[in-house]
Amino acid sequence: PGLAFSGLTPEHSALARAHPCDGEQFCQNLAPEDPQGDQLLQREELGLICESCRKIIQKLEDMVGPQPNEDTVTQAASRVCDKMKILRGVCKKIMRTFLRRISKDILTGKKPQAICVDIKICKEKTGLI
């Protein structure tokens, strides 16, 4: 309910409702000491997950090479998370959930920031030229 007007697909809706760090090791040390820090913490976590997304997509683009096609993107996507060390769990979740969209965006030449905005992990930066 409500998805029809939100512009979100069911997969985007589930990710939007899920905490960006659910079960991810690198986020476990981010628990706030006091409840008033929750808003700041959420912004910091979103910043961390956005930065992680950009790093993962950049690594994927580097592995795909200068002339990507569906096969090279799929092959690179199956290997990229093993190269991400601490971001491996987040990488696998992103690839499992959004590979089709990421692949399409890479094939159209989008940059990592734009791809992470498309999959709703990063917010669009406003006011920048």
Curated annotation (Swiss-Prot):
Its BP terms in the Gene Ontology are:
antimicrobial humoral immune response mediated by antimicrobial peptide; defense response to bacterium; defense response to fungus; killing of cells of another organism; lipid metabolic process
Disulphide linkage map: 50-122, 53-116, 81-91
Q: Which residues form the Saposin B-type domain?
A: 46-126
Q: Give the UniProt tissue specificity note.
A: Cytotoxic T and NK cells.
Presence of the UniProt keyword Cell wall biogenesis/degradation in the record: no
Task: Supply the residue numbers of the propeptide(s) excised during maturation.
Answer: 7-46, 125-129
Q: Which PROSITE patterns match?
A: SAP_B
**What broad class describes the main subcellular location of this protein?**
secreted
The record's Gene Ontology cellular component field reads: extracellular region
SMART domains the record matches:
SapB
The leader peptide range reads 1-6
SUPFAM superfamilies the record matches: Saposin
Q: Which Pfam families match?
A: SapB_1, SapB_2
Q: Which InterPro entries match?
A: Granulysin-like (IPR038847), SapB_1 (IPR007856), SapB_2 (IPR008138), Saposin-like (IPR011001), SaposinB_dom (IPR008139)
Keyword annotations: Antibiotic, Antimicrobial, Disulfide bond, Fungicide, Secreted, Signal
**Top-rank taxon, per record:** Eukaryota
Q: What induces it?
A: By interleukin-2.
Q: Where in the cell is it found?
A: Secreted
Biological role stated in the UniProt entry: May be an effector molecule of cytotoxic activity. High activity against E.coli and B.megaterium, moderate against A.calcoaceticus and S.pyogenes. No activity against P.aeruginosa, S.aureus and Salmonella. Has some antifungal activity against C.albicans.
Name this protein carries in UniProt: Antimicrobial peptide NK-lysin
